[in-house]
Swiss-Prot record:
InterPro entries: ConA-like_dom_sf, L-lectin, Lectin_LegA_CS, Lectin_legB_Mn/Ca_BS, Legume_lectin_dom, Leguminous_Lectin. One of its GO terms (molecular function) is D-mannose binding. It comes from Vigna unguiculata subsp. cylindrica (Horse gram). Glycans are attached at residues 34, 101. This is Lectin DB58. The lineage of its organism: Eukaryota, Viridiplantae, Streptophyta, Embryophyta, Tracheophyta. Keywords: Calcium, Glycoprotein, Lectin, Mannose-binding, Signal.
Length: 275
């Protein structure tokens, strides 16, 4: 994602960004992917320098019942149990979903924070991230889903962006119009001072934008160290398929300490120094 695009996202949504004290920065940026930097699970591969999360046939069309996950190879510390400090973080990525039949696309892609060593979870509507639509603290998983199929047991009636906390049943959703086969520019931020998780998505080709936010106390929901990355699934019934590609990805996080009192805006840092 170009830094100018992220700047547009920031100005459009006027995100409430962190004012926590500065400290060590964990950051990375991929404009071309290589398998050595990732833990690839299920059907996920690195293909033509992009993350291809679900299986594609030789003719480029997606397959049924595919599940793939890709996580950054190094754990990320998101809080410090000994001091109580909590990290603010921001991530941006460009994703592309293509459904041969847009009216029957399934199932979606998620950005997820999971326990280190986590294995793929249930297929189809669970997006490979969860096993249940009932809250379960032992899952220790927070995700932002970009859901292309409405599962009547737990989803709203339309495609949506959702914030998921230890369950596939989102605690907050916003309707989302899929721009089929078009790139989506996504920015997700977490403000440790307010516990506010914000996800925004822009389709530059259509000049459409979407945003969802909710407060999440990650110290109650996640382990101290997590793996971060992506998970995606396709449907189980004929015709309910789509491709899921991540074309670029950047991340920055900041865990406060007492060595400095100068505020740092983590999302601005991401734009200036990582992208």
């Amino acid at each position: 994602m170009a830094s100018s695009t992220v700047s547009v996202v920031l100005s459009l949504f006027l995100l409430l960004l962190t004012q926590a004290y500065s400290a060590d920065i964990q950051s990375f940026s991929f404009k071309n992917f290589n398998s050595s930097s990732f833990i690839l699970q299920g059907d996920a591969t690195v293909s033509s320098s992009k993350l291809r999360l679900t299986k594609v046939k030789g003719n480029g069309l997606p397959t049924l019942s595919s599940l793939g996950r890709a996580f950054y190879s190094s754990p990320i510390q998101i809080y410090d149990k000994s001091t109580g400090a909590v990290a603010s973080w921001a991530t941006s990525f460009t994703a592309n979903i293509f459904a041969p039949n847009k009216s029957s696309s399934a199932d979606g892609i998620a950005f997820a924070l999971v326990p280190v060593g986590s294995e793929p979870k249930s297929n189809s509507g669970f997006l490979g991230v969860f096993d249940s639509d009932v809250y379960d603290n032992s899952a220790q998983t927070v995700a932002v889903e970009f859901d292309t199929f409405s599962n009547t047991d737990w989803d709203p009636t339309s495609r949506h962006i959702g914030i998921d906390v230890n369950s596939i049943k989102s605690i907050r959703t916003a309707s989302w119009g899929l721009a089929n086969g078009q790139n989506a520019e996504i920015l997700i931020t977490y403000n440790a001072a307010t516990s506010l998780l914000v996800a925004s998505l822009v389709h530059p080709s259509r000049r459409t934008s979407y945003i969802v936010s909710e407060r999440v106390d990650i110290t109650n929901e996640l382990p101290e160290y997590v793996s971060i990355g992506f998970s995606a699934t396709t449907g189980l019934s004929e015709g309910y398929t789509e491709t899921h590609d991540v074309l670029s990805w950047s991340f920055a996080s900041k865990l406060p300490d007492d060595s400095t009192t100068e505020p740092l805006d983590i999302a601005s840092y991401l734009v200036r120094n990582v992208l």
